[in-house]
Amino acid sequence: MREGTGNNFMSLQFAAKSENEAFARVAVAAFISRLDPTMDELSDLKTVVSEAVTNSIIHGYDSDPSGVVTIKVGIEADVITLVVEDAGRGIEDLELAKQPLYTSKPELERSGMGFTIMENFMDEFEAVSEPGGGTSVRMKKRIESKKALYN
């Protein structure tokens, strides 16, 4: 996702406020719209953006609006690469955090399904985190649209 590689890409940064989650979803959907994704593909992508951004806000920054969430999206042929990053508190036990129904904030009545949803809705999923060093979630999805073959 770098300039000059022939790929199309975008980068977006915003305050770690819950109201920005919808903005992030719409921005990513608008950017990938030229690939003419199906409604299911678009819904999947919007859902994973919501999950990743919400994780950054709630878990990474503990709902501190001074934090910054970064989204990077790259398009190469028919493949979308999506990266959501924060410089928050990081995840102590990433493997535990990836377990379905696990949540570090049970008082918020969250389902603990964010990573599971991201992993199941995307073709590739990788999370990297270090306690005190933030979290980066990188995902890829191939768009089935015929239009994607010509862009």
UniProtKB/Swiss-Prot annotation:
Documented EC number(s): 2.7.11.1
Chemical reaction(s) catalysed: L-seryl-[protein] + ATP = O-phospho-L-seryl-[protein] + ADP + H(+); L-threonyl-[protein] + ATP = O-phospho-L-threonyl-[protein] + ADP + H(+)
InterPro entries: Anti-sigma-factor_SerPK, Anti-sigma_F, HATPase_C_sf
Entry annotated with the keyword Ligase: no
GO MF term set: ATP binding; protein serine kinase activity; protein serine/threonine kinase activity; sigma factor antagonist activity
Pfam families cross-referenced by the UniProt entry: HATPase_c_2
Family note: Belongs to the anti-sigma-factor family.
Official protein name in the record: Anti-sigma F factor
